[in-house]
Design a protein with these regions (language model features):
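N-terminal hydrophobic/helix-forming segments and targeting peptides
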Residues: 2-176
């Protein structure tokens, strides 16, 4: 789980691994993980991002449907019937108001159905401000790893491998 602004679990996992290879591991005020391999030469920065796209609950209507806003770039038409998972494990499916022509979809026409009978029931599971990520299976097929957010996390893995391989260096290296 690691939508933009809520990457704590991802950051902690990366920091635990990076600590074996790096001199300093810190987090700045914005939540960036900064891993430093000390050197006396030039400062060199290697960067990757650990967040993922998702949604944030903005309103719960009287029917218990959760209205949401996007976190990152989303294509509205691709969201229909997609499963999302909130940090507390609650799952829901994105749907849209039946009267809306598909070509006219906006976030205002979409909602997350968690199976709640009404607003009070929904609020027992999800609060306004809760983040959710898109849930899809991870699997290996024909020697290839498939799954969501790999485009985001492969950069982190690459930086971890670089930290592991770098050894001693004259330059001051920053992995962010």
């Amino acid at each position: 789980f690691g939508p933009s602004g809520r990457e704590d679990a991802v950051r902690e996992a990366i920091a635990a691994i990076a600590g074996e290879y790096i001199d300093d591991v810190t987090t700045d005020a914005l939540g960036n993980l900064i891993c430093r391999k000390k050197g006396s030469g030039k400062k060199v920065l290697f960067a990757a991002h650990m967040d993922s796209i998702g949604v944030v609950a903005t309103y719960i209507d009287e029917k218990g449907f959760i209205r949401f806003s996007q976190v990152g770039g989303l294509f509205k038409g691709d969201l229909i019937n997609i499963t999302v998972r909130f940090a507390n494990g609650t799952r829901g499916v994105i749907s849209y108001e039946e009267k809306t022509p598909f070509k006219d979809l906006t976030l205002d026409n979409l909602f997350i159905d968690i199976g709640a009978k009404d607003r009070a029931d929904a609020e027992k599971q999800v609060q306004v401000g809760d983040f959710a990520v898109f849930e899809a299976p991870r699997f290996e097929q024909n020697g290839v790893l498939c799954g969501p957010y790999l485009d985001n996390r492969i950069g982190c893995v690459t930086l971890l491998r670089a930290m592991e391989q770098v050894g001693e260096t004259d330059n001051d290296l920053y992995f962010v």
